[in-house]
Regions:
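Non-catalytic cap/lid and distal C-terminal segments of serine-dependent acyl enzymes
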Residues: 1-159
Length: 159
């Protein structure tokens, strides 16, 4: 953050905050930075991520893993935390297919959708079809679908 955010700020002439984008493990990272630092990011497009860090550690968790596990840190965020208003002014898009190799992404996105609803966070959780697999061909289609909505502002506060 100490290097990449100033680098982007020097070159960004739009006046808009950057959007974190990623697929698979990159989706988890995009979600983490957008949710941990809504002051620095205008949102995220997270495709086919797993948002429970304990998945990668066999259930083991410490404070560092917790801080990087959206399913955990959001669950325990107070419902009146000032970040929630910031989230609702951002484009938070989480999508997953329902085809091959997407099962863990589906289960953690269902958890995230439930947390978002309970906290009043207007993130867009989109579950694509049963033919949509954990693959680049689909991520290319998804980014072409979501990016224009982020750029025109129609994804802000989307339910």
């Amino acid at each position: 953050m100490d290097e990449v955010i100033p680098f982007i700020a020097q070159r960004n002439t739009s006046g808009r905050l950057p959007i974190a984008v990623g697929c698979s493990l990159g989706a988890m990272h995009a979600g983490i930075v957008a949710l941990r630092r809504p002051d620095l990011f205008g949102g995220c497009i997270a495709m086919s991520g797993i948002y429970d860090a304990s998945y990668f550690t066999g259930g083991w968790m410490n404070s560092k893993w917790y801080d990087n596990s959206p399913c955990h840190f959001l669950q325990n965020m107070p419902s009146d935390h000032y970040y929630i208003n910031m989230y609702n002014e951002r484009s938070l898009i989480f999508c997953v297919g329902q085809g091959a190799w997407e099962q863990n992404g589906i289960s953690t996105l269902l958890i995230m959708a439930s947390i978002f609803q309970k906290k009043g966070i207007h993130a867009w959780c989109d579950f694509w079809g049963y033919d949509v697999s954990h693959d680049w061909d689909w991520w290319k289609k998804q980014i072409r679908y979501f990016l224009p909505k982020v750029l025109d502002g129609s994804a802000i506060g989307n339910k």
